[in-house]
């Protein structure tokens, strides 16, 4: 499965309780509809925007990392579009994290093979 990162910004005039509910709904949507495995949810809170969006100078930022086969990401895009509380969103495939994970797995496999070789040579 591939690793993805999605970041979205919720309008700051939405209540804190409603913003928390929206984040949970996105997580649930990813798990149930996209069949993704959500790994981390990182709430940044209300931050100043780089530029004004509509009438807003601030927004509530959230970043989610999840694993998915890539199917259903268009459904996530549509989910954000139909909910006016979301000002901006973007989803990226994190190939850098995938490479890092593969590299670590190869190193671990290499270490395991070295340990087996050392054990075999010490028993002879």
UniProtKB/Swiss-Prot annotation:
The keyword Transferase does not apply. It holds the Pfam family Ribosomal_S6. One of its GO terms (cellular component) is ribosome. Residues 110-124 have a biased composition (Polar residues). Keywords: Ribonucleoprotein, Ribosomal protein, RNA-binding, rRNA-binding. CDD domains: bS6 (cd00473). Residues 100-124 are annotated as: Disordered. GO terms for molecular function: small ribosomal subunit rRNA binding; structural constituent of ribosome. GO terms for biological process: translation. The keyword Transmembrane helix does not apply. Coiled coil: none annotated. Belongs to the bacterial ribosomal protein bS6 family. Binds together with bS18 to 16S ribosomal RNA. This is Small ribosomal subunit protein bS6. It comes from Fervidobacterium nodosum (strain ATCC 35602 / DSM 5306 / Rt17-B1).
